[in-house]
Amino acid sequence: MKRYLIVFFIVFNIAALSQNRFHVNAATTLLGFPSLGYETQINKHLSFHIDAIGSAFNSYNDKPLRFLIVTPEMRYYPKNDHKGFFVGAHLGGSTFKLQKYGYEDSNYYQKGYNYMAGASIGYVYFVSEKIALEAFVGGGTVQSFYKGYDATTGERYDGAEKFNKSGEWLPYRGGISVILHL
């Protein structure tokens, strides 16, 4: 009986996901930063998209390179078929342990978290009924909170009491995704 319930559950979930899309950002994944996403249709023009990207490495050039970014996004498609041009608004967050730009010639690295708020634009092109390609870019404000460490001693180098803080306007999203429409 348990087997039948498990099979029913799997079949029911596949049927329930029939209007949904799974995304793999081919561009970042090939560079060693796997990015997976999920999108579900809300109405004729709106969808909810969420993706996560992370580092497949512990380090690069003997420097720390670990991060995970999760970004939920609301997308608006002017056409009612959820293909073609779209715009999106998103809020995201990340955790990281890496060496920031400008510290390449030192033993210093930064560890912390940030949040991001911004917009994306993109285009979805269906290759077949079930497979599509998506090109997109996005950016906005990035507000970071981190502590600086010396990799040789493990001691903090920055002198900040709690966290260093920085805020920038940056392009931080983009790529070419392969989409599987279920």
Predicted regions and their residues:
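Flexible, solvent-exposed loop segments that connect beta-strands
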Residues: 54-64, 93-114, 144-167
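Membrane-embedded beta-strand positions of outer-membrane beta-barrel proteins
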Residues: 24-26, 50-52, 72, 87-91, ...
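Sec-dependent N-terminal signal peptides
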Residues: 4-14
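Membrane-embedded beta-strands of outer-membrane beta-barrel proteins
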Residues: 36, 72, 119-121, 174-178
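Repeated loop/turn-to-beta-strand initiation elements of outer-membrane beta-barrel proteins
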Residues: 45-48, 82-83, 129-133
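Residues that define the transmembrane beta-barrel architecture of outer-membrane proteins
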Residues: 20, 30-32, 64-70, 83, ...
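Outer-membrane beta-barrel "beta-signal"
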Residues: 76-77, 168-182
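Transmembrane beta-strands of outer-membrane beta-barrel pores
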Residues: 28-30, 52-58, 76, 91-97, ...
